[in-house]
Amino acid sequence: MMCLIIYLSIFLIIVSRMLTGLPMMDRPDEGGLARRTVGEVEGEFSYRDDVDVADVRNLFIMLPKNGSDIFLFIFDRRSQRQRGTMFLFPKAGFVQPTPAKVRDEAAAAPFGFISPVYPLSSLLFNPYNGRYLTTRHLIAFEVTPESSLHDWYFARSPTTATQTQPLGHITNPPRRSPKDKPTTSGHTDLIIRYCALELDFFQDTRRQRDGIYLPNYEAVWPLAMNFLEGMWIWSNRTLVNVTIGVGFMGFSLTSISYPPLEIIVTPHYTNARMITRFKSSLVLDPPGPSEGPLYKVYVLGYGNNRINGSFYKTMRTIASYPRTKPRLSLPPFHGTYGTALFLSHATPQDMDGTTAYISKISTRLATALFSLSEVRRLSGYVAIDELIDLDFNTRLLANTLLADGMQNFQDPINITYYYNSDVGRTHLRDALDTIDHQHVSHGSLITRARYLQLIYTYTSMEKQSQLSLKLSGDIVKDLYLETLYSDVVRWNTTAKQALFLSSMLIYIAGNIQSSVEQEAINAGRMLFLQCTSMCTTEHASTVRWNPQQILYDLTKSSTRFNIFDGFSPCMASNRYDIISPYGILDLFSAFPISSYRSIEKPAVDSNTHNIIFNLRNLYTFIPELFSCPGVSSNHQRPIAVLPIGINCTYLITRRDPRRGTLYIVDGIDVSNPIIISYLRSGECGIERGIILPGNLNNPENTDQCLYCGCVFMRYKSSGEIVDLLLINDKAVELELVAGENSTISAFNPTKYSSPSSVLLLFPNGTIVTLMAFTSHEVIVFSSNFIWASIGGVFAACLIIYIIIKMLCSFTPDVRYTLLNN
């Protein structure tokens, strides 16, 4: 469809016989465009499509000298200025005295005394002629409801603002503000204070610039506005464009795979104008709900109750997203303003569901930026945590929007802020370069988590890998040890955020080519083991798997919602037997990465697509699973996957995978068997292994960690696997052999009410039934005893020496008597 709005830099020709004064020539209609074809009745508007430029030259000569017609010719951009559309207007429309630009003079305190937004509903700067552009040709693609005014107006959401409830539905805490003039500390202090949950503020120094917003839907007239900032989220297949002005937001979502969507937000007294199929006397705004206390929302998309009804329902839903009152006390951008809705939908299984899914996510991102911009403008400042929160979640959800929602795994995803949007963000990037990373690594869990958030948000993927890999690994290890030694682990938002960010950054580092790629692969395999160990049956029973339940709980609470509240170690694990089928796993599956390697999608059962590290991650971090094409192990739904060594993995399944060294666990319900396969990279043969019964050596009397790297597996005769725990250091090993005296409840058999058995899986492929640990009696002498003994021996020797010396030095007095006769 050619562009028909005259403000789009199109070449146009307006000729009238009155202006040219050329004589009327009686010649045949060589171009086939007779006078009656263009407009036989004086004073009427008509048009003709697909007109050749030669026809225009003919008409130029044919029009009468003092006629009352004016015609306009618009080239089709694809025709190289040879063909286009011609319109014939009555001349009277261009001599009306109505001014072209009329602003609404209504007073509005947040916007000044003159509206910052007003429509340019005119033709050649004359609004009188706008009524002529109401033909079917201009809206043949049916962008809006056309036959029923009931479809034109949307019901307002009960959670948005009204005159009686100007703050709408409250789910966020009060916004903090600077006590004095908003200031920003130095670079280093900026990050340290943020990580320590102390506020810094930026002043709102954005500049306004006059601009014109050109809607993607050409039926809507352009809007004059005061431009502030904007954002693009784009790939080779998709573009999300957000334009922010004073009291104005323009949002558009365009893709080669899905129908377009556009949202326009204006001050509540601004009447946008559009071309419709109704008669010119019925002037309508674009579709949308009624205005709120400050803003009016318009939604444009392809759908109504009769045509594309599912998308029309989506349009009505997202019309309630832009808040109709700037929440100076309750900013909706905290915690991502869009994550609550994001978690309320399972991953769609069809095209209509996917369209609604990505439309809602992208709209939430746009309205979050608009809300922050308005609150920032009205208050004169922005808190650093508000800006970081928005940027972090925008980057996070952009991956879902473009990569997962659009099935666009191969194209890079880009986020571009323009004009005033980079104010403050440059300062944050500079601050990251001055921080002492070693100092942060020794901080508290919340300090390290917020630092990882900054790294993810404001650095490149290459730099992310270098700065975050070791820190991420340490965080995962600390959380794993805490879960081992604590009977009740408090998985609060901080712990979930730290685990999520650590998992995500390790994942990114392993999926890009960098100097630490191999180190990242090793860290990722260890991450799998530790998260699988943390995903016990007891923990899984406490996870809120249902997104709808999470949203329901949110509506009943006044606390701030965070996307991390729905995260769990199970979502970053390779444990598949205790997960729930709800869609929350699908929601988290698309988060971590910004660009993917160009690889073929591994052939894994569709039931495993919804775990955060499956499909893309299993192929990257555990390639030995897919090193034998065509083997059935590539197509099974496993119980668990344990990357236990270098290029070696234990695969636990219910069916024989026909690959690797196979161990069949005895004493298990025949309907629910446990088969353990030890897989090596490139080895596709089959061997039968034997699980060895017996006692193991007690490692208490040695400093060497005999069982580090092994996996402790507790199971029941029913086939249920209770625990899969990694032995990762000497302290955990000693707890393992302590038995009933172990402070780790998973190692203590008295903690289990029903009988269970234990296997120990070694990194070399050996599996042993754990019966007991054999203790050998060893006489141990303390160092004090040894030194005392040495001293005693020395003293005894000294005494003996003295005695001998005395005996040897003694001379007897022997006297002889001469015997005489």
Swiss-Prot record:
Signal peptide start-end: 1-20
Keywords: Fusion of virus membrane with host cell membrane, Fusion of virus membrane with host membrane, Glycoprotein, Host cell membrane, Host endosome, Host membrane, Membrane, Sialic acid, Signal, Transmembrane, Transmembrane helix, Viral envelope protein, Viral penetration into host cytoplasm, Virion, Virus entry into host cell
Gene3D superfamilies linked to this entry: 1.20.58.1340, 3.30.500.50, Herpesvirus glycoprotein H, C-terminal domain (2.60.40.3190)
PTM field: N-glycosylated, O-glycosylated, and sialylated.
Residue ranges, annotated region (Interaction with gL): 236-299
Keyword Methyltransferase set for record: no
Main location group: virion
Membrane protein topology class: Single-pass type I membrane protein
Residue ranges annotated as Virion surface topological domain: 21-783
UniProt-listed InterPro entries: Herpes_gH, Herpes_glycoH_C, Herpes_glycoH_C_sf
An individual GO BP term: symbiont entry into host cell
Keyword Transcription: no
A GO cellular-component term linked to this record: virion membrane
UniProt region (Disordered), positions on chain: 163-186
Pfam family, one: Herpes_glycoH_C
Transmembrane segments annotated in the record for this chain: 784-804
Ranges in the topological domain labelled Intravirion: 805-821
Compartment list: Virion membrane; Host cell membrane; Host endosome membrane
Glycosylation site positions: N66, N236, N241, N308, N414, N492, N647, N741, N764
HAMAP family: HSV_GH
Family according to the record: Belongs to the herpesviridae glycoprotein H family.
Quaternary structure annotation from Swiss-Prot or TrEMBL: Interacts with glycoprotein L (gL); this interaction is necessary for the correct processing and cell surface expression of gH. The heterodimer gH/gL seems to interact with gB trimers during fusion.
Function in brief: The heterodimer glycoprotein H-glycoprotein L is required for the fusion of viral and plasma membranes leading to virus entry into the host cell. Following initial binding to host receptor, membrane fusion is mediated by the fusion machinery composed of gB and the heterodimer gH/gL. May also be involved in the fusion between the virion envelope and the outer nuclear membrane during virion morphogenesis.
Protein's name in the database: Envelope glycoprotein H
Upper taxonomic lineage: Viruses, Duplodnaviria, Heunggongvirae, Peploviricota, Herviviricetes
Encoding gene (name): gH
